[in-house]
């Protein structure tokens, strides 16, 4: 599933092409995604100029003068920028095209867990949308601190890894990045969130930012389907300290990496480096 780094890589790849350009038309071939594509979306966007492309958590927010169209990539979704001249014929899983003058922005999603929604400007700020309003803080914002994590976890018995994954404290820390961040911070993922001290949470906040920044720099992680807007795979997964390295020696101390299951998801950690 594309997480924050993959969505941010997509945003950075798309924005230079679409910002300041007008949508000539929208072709919706499959309306039944995770939620139905709004029936009037094509008409709402016709001849509209894209003002900006923002990311909130794992959502992409395309702003036009009349509102925002919101895209979520789901588990297998991608957005590709294709030249209008000679654009490939749409395949089975190519559900939506936004046609501009010189290129096509194509949404592909084999499993159809992604979404394309519309938020009109008269409904208020897009960040008040029900899917966005309850999200945690952005990991690169000044609001994301060790003090925030410490305050929000007092008395909580859930594991620190599961607390990170929940998304109500900080957004975008998916399974890979939670394991990697906890390794960098030296925190065992099974530790109760409420038992982690303030200094350790300060290290964790720094580790989350560093891990996500490294992943974005490497184009995200491609475990199965993800490619960026240019069709290239990410390669962060090749440099992971612990994720998907069960039984292999820790890159720091040489102890075999352990794999456990938490909340039906695989967790990887070093029993020596993480306490």
Swiss-Prot record:
The keyword DNA repair applies. The keyword Ribosomal protein does not apply. Binds 1 zinc ion per subunit. PROSITE patterns: FPG_CAT (PS51068), ZF_FPG_1 (PS01242), ZF_FPG_2 (PS51066). NCBIfam families: fpg (TIGR00577), PRK01103.1 (NF002211). Involved in base excision repair of DNA damaged by oxidation or by mutagenic agents. Acts as a DNA glycosylase that recognizes and removes damaged bases. Has a preference for oxidized purines, such as 7,8-dihydro-8-oxoguanine (8-oxoG). Has AP (apurinic/apyrimidinic) lyase activity and introduces nicks in the DNA strand. Cleaves the DNA backbone by beta-delta elimination to generate a single-strand break at the site of the removed base with both 3'- and 5'-phosphates. This is Formamidopyrimidine-DNA glycosylase.
């Amino acid at each position: 599933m594309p997480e924050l780094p993959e969505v941010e890589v997509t945003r950075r790849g798309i924005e230079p092409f679409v910002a300041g350009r007008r949508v000539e038309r929208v072709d919706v071939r499959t309306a039944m995604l995770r939620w139905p594509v709004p029936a009037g979306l094509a008409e709402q966007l016709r001849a509209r100029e894209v003002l900006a492309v923002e990311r909130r958590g794992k959502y992409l927010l395309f702003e036009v003068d009349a509102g925002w169209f919101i895209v979520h990539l789901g588990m297998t979704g991608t957005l590709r920028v294709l030249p209008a001249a000679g654009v490939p014929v749409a395949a089975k899983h190519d559900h939506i095209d936004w046609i501009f003058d010189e290129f096509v922005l194509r949404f592909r999603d084999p499993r159809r867990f992604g979404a394309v929604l519309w938020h009109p400007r008269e409904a208020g700020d897009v960040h008040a949308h029900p899917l966005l309003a309850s999200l945690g803080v952005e990991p690169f914002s000044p609001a994301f601190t060790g003090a925030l994590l410490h305050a929000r976890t007092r008395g909580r018995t859930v594991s620190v890894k599961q607390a990170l994954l929940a998304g109500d404290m900080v957004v975008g820390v998916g399974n890979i990045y939670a394991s990697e961040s906890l390794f960098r911070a030296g925190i065992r993922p099974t530790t109760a969130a409420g038992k982690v001290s303030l200094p350790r949470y300060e290290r964790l906040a720094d580790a989350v930012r560093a891990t996500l920044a490294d992943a974005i720099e490497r184009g995200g992680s491609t475990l199965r389907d993800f490619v960026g807007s240019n069709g290239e795979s990410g390669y962060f997964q090749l440099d992971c300290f612990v994720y998907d390295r069960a039984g292999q020696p820790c890159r720091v101390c040489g102890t075999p990496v352990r794999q456990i299951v938490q909340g039906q998801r695989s967790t990887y950690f070093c029993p020596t480096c993480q306490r």
